[in-house]
């Protein structure tokens, strides 16, 4: 994996290193041209599936989408298989929450804390009605001692109600 941004080891914070040094996608593309048999994946600043597809179309073997996929998984991860590979359908965030329940329950039974998982679920509904209330319920409820699946249920109910209210006003 080649990161298209050169990190500056002195003078910049980690956050500044994600923004200030320029991205050099052409360098990665030139590397692939020069070493066509080498498996190269590109990383750095890629935020959309269209960008990813563009690199794949130009011969790059793989594309890493980091923060964008984490913060808005419904727009990136759930659509990757159908849009990039032409397989399956986009995952519905509500179905993702349902599918996560057994994993969450097992984690809690093993002594884990809800917030250790729920913090990674905050972006599931980004851009959809009720996303803010979903995040608030998880952020406030999950860190509480003994928090369990009831927090997920309450967040989902509140989000669904907010979504219905929004639909009624349209």
Model regions: which residues?
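Glycine-rich, proline-tolerant flexible connector loops at the mouths of alpha/beta enzymes
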Residues: 4-18
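Non-cysteine beta-strand/loop elements that form the S-adenosyl-L-methionine
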Residues: 1-7, 65-68
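Alpha/beta catalytic cores of nucleotide-metabolism and tRNA/nucleoside-modifying enzymes
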Residues: 19, 23-170
